[in-house]
Amino acid sequence: QAAADKLEALGVINSQDYWADAAEAGKVQYLEILLKKAAQTITKAKPRTGTPQEGVAALVAAGVINTPDYWLANYDTFPSLDLLLCALGGAVK
């Protein structure tokens, strides 16, 4: 929850409860780790990436994720996960 709260305070996401609940409930594998690492790395909101693939690439380059294949294979399995990856990816650039 703290990671999602920080990301919302920075303006990166605007639905921290949605993502915190999804992470805590285990609805998306590794989501909690993604949010925590992103919150440790991101200092401010920036323009989103155009695609989830670009977001994943930026997150890999920033050291936030090390499992790009998982995220590329699963970004369309949970509502708005693709948009989250775009937001986080843009913010780490």
Regions found by a protein language model. Name each.
Residues Q1-K93:
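Extracellular cell-wall/glycan-interacting regions and their flexible linkers
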